[in-house]
Regions:
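Short, conserved catalytic/metal-binding motifs centered on acidic residues
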Residues: 1, 33, 40, 59, ...
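RNase H-like polynucleotidyl transferase catalytic core
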Residues: 16-24, 92-111, 124-125
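RNase H-like two-metal-ion nuclease catalytic core shared by retroviral integrases
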Residues: 28, 78-80, 99-119, 130-132
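Acidic, metal-coordinating catalytic cores used for nucleic-acid/nucleotide bond scission
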Residues: 1, 50-51, 74-87, 101-106
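C-terminal anion-handling pockets and recognition modules
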Residues: 110-158
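Short amphipathic alpha-helical segments
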Residues: 6-8, 88-91
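Extended, low-complexity cationic-aromatic segments
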Residues: 1-56, 60, 156-157
Length: 158
């Protein structure tokens, strides 16, 4: 998530230009998350940057938060980011499922990221890193606290 105003359509007077706010400096946070499309159970952590060590930390925390169930496969749908493919990753009780190249839309969590950005970050600019973190935490907690809404966003309709 960044402090870049998300563009939307708006009406303006003919011949005038709409003002688009910007801060002039770059503030960024990375969210790594997992969602169960059926139950809406959602887990995420916020980082300043992502690499294989950070991703391993996230996997370790996810493994503690989502315990294994006998007879249940736990799939992690992943894009082809370099840190997803490091040979030394400990997957715990999860099974990685890599998407074909250039097809992130097949990942259910991508719909959640789009909704989160639309609902919480359209037309909003973070003034500080703390502002961004507060807004981001509020947005993530909303989806954690409303699993039925999260499931409806992320589930595949048949």
């Amino acid at each position: 998530m960044e402090n870049v105003a998300r563009s939307t359509s708006r009406w303006v007077q003919p011949g005038s230009k709409p003002k688009v706010p910007h801060l002039g400096k770059h503030i960024r946070r990375n969210v790594v998350g997992a969602v169960c499309p059926q139950s809406g159970e959602f887990f995420s952590l916020i980082f300043d940057g992502v690499d294989s060590a950070v991703f391993q930390c996230w996997l370790d925390e996810l493994a503690q938060s989502v315990p294994p169930k006998p007879g249940v496969r736990r799939l992690l749908v992943l894009d082809n980011a370099s840190w997803h493919k490091v040979k030394t990753l400990q997957w715990h009780h999860f099974e990685p499922l890599f998407l074909p190249p250039y097809s992130p839309d097949f990942n259910p969590i991508e719909r959640l990221w789009l909704r989160l950005k639309a609902d919480y970050f359209t037309g909003w600019i973070a003034r500080t890193g703390e502002d961004l973190m507060e807004r981001l935490c509020n947005a993530l907690n909303h989806f954690i606290d409303h699993p039925s809404k999260t499931a409806s966003i992320c589930s595949f309709r048949q």
